[in-house]
Regions:
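Catalytic loop of short-chain dehydrogenase/reductase
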Residues: 2-3, 9, 15-17, 21, ...
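A short, exposed helix-loop element centered on a Lys and neighboring polar residues
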Residues: 33-34, 78
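A conserved structural motif in NAD(P)-dependent oxidoreductases
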Residues: 121-132
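Short C-terminal tail/terminal secondary-structure segment
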Residues: 137, 148-171
Length: 171
């Protein structure tokens, strides 16, 4: 989605920006699946994987319309898995925590995001791209043959936390 559609209040999202976000983040995966499914059927099955983000379930500052688009993507994963399962085609998503990359360095306040994740994740650390790749290998390989319609969180447990640790600062 255009940068202003992410940073402006959600209520100010235009129809065009909404459509762009859904087209790029959701429909593109459906279109890719439509193209790949016949090839996978001929091979006796396969596995499709997409990336999503916790902003699909929770409100994150400066994510706005992308959160709605990712929620639609996750629903699409479930519907596609139901439709394609009988042909032995698995459809899943990975919801990764923030990863320190060159692209991420351009995100305002990204070091603060990393700090919050590290402080509140049960594993008390951030993740790296290799850990996301390992999860993808599992889901795409025969090791994940019984997994479909799922969103696998690779975020050091951050998604599982409610308020996080409550500290008594009065003492």
């Amino acid at each position: 989605a255009p940068r202003e559609a992410i940073t402006q209040p959600f209520l100010e999202t235009t129809r065009e920006d909404f459509q762009v976000a859904l087209d790029i983040s959701t429909y593109s995966f459906v279109a890719l699946t439509r193209a790949a499914a016949p090839l996978m059927v001929r091979r006796g099955g396969g596995s499709l994987l997409t990336l999503t983000y916790l902003g699909s379930e929770r409100v994150f500052p400066n994510y706005n319309v992308m959160g709605v688009a990712k929620a639609a993507l996750e629903a699409s994963v479930r519907y596609l898995s139901s439709e394609l399962g009988p042909q032995q085609i698995r459809v899943n998503a990975i919801s990764a925590g923030p990863i320190k990359t060159l692209a991420a360095s351009g995100i305002s306040g990204f070091s603060d995001i990393l700090s919050v994740y590290r402080a509140h994740a049960p594993l008390r650390r951030n993740i790296d791209a290799g850990e996301v790749a390992d999860a993808a290998l599992f889901l795409l390989s025969n090791a994940g043959r019984a997994v479909t319609g799922e969103v696998l969180f690779v975020d050091a447990g951050y998604h599982a936390m409610g308020l996080g640790e409550i500290r008594n600062d009065d003492q």
